[in-house]
């Protein structure tokens, strides 16, 4: 486990300048299953509009994203579910702690189709990922890691690997030999975001600090043509939740709630300023 040092890149002064250097990067967003649970399990009830029932159940997609870089090869953003969620429903390869939590909160994982898991998707499209960038260390984002080769390079925020994360992720990282920590405090500001890192130094992939849901949650921008895409992970729950100004959950108390609000404000400001950039979510098959 080591801290990743991003190469020095071009000194961009704003996102418009970044977008002017966009490259054609083939990419896909794909769903690996669903999480079925009440809205109040995933968001702050005090932020719900009157037409949203906190106890209403939704099936939330468990998304992963793939793109191909001209020199760094195939890259994933998050991993979704592996095949165990179809073979051993409803909790697949989740840790004991996650099974207890999901049982108490009446949450279930659904993968009714046996070929939508991460491994099946990669095999079907003949993809061997060289790199995986994680938005955060929650099990529904790391549960596909066992389907990947041990030498796959894995990246996530430096402050994520706390005891809680280890309990939630269980054995998802078992055997993985190349883990890199992203120190977002070294990143500069590109308004409206306070800390961003040009990960490859060529303007193609950016990590963006969006803490709150977890302490070092990250969003990622893929600078592709004709339209860049911003993957916000769980900093925003879904497209409709963002439109309703619903705030995601946090286990970090008042500090976490303040960070969730600040991160949501930055994402919503970015969307208002750059409406042509597609906003993608970890739990929605639709984008804004």
Q: What kind of region is each of these model predictions?
A:
Residues 83, 88, 98-124, 226-288:
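Cap/insert and terminal regions of metallo-dependent hydrolase folds
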Residues 137-143, 162-163, 215-218, 237-240, ...:
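Active-site environment of divalent metal-dependent phosphoester hydrolases
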Residues 1-140, 147, 153-209, 227-233, 255-275:
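Metallo-beta-lactamase
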Residues 192-247:
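Glycine/small-residue-rich hydrophobic helix-like segments
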Residues 32-33, 79-81, 137, 212-214, ...:
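Active-site metal-binding loops of divalent metal-dependent hydrolases
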Residues 28-30, 75, 133, 155, ...:
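Hydrophobic/aromatic beta-strand patches that form the interior of the parallel beta-sheet core
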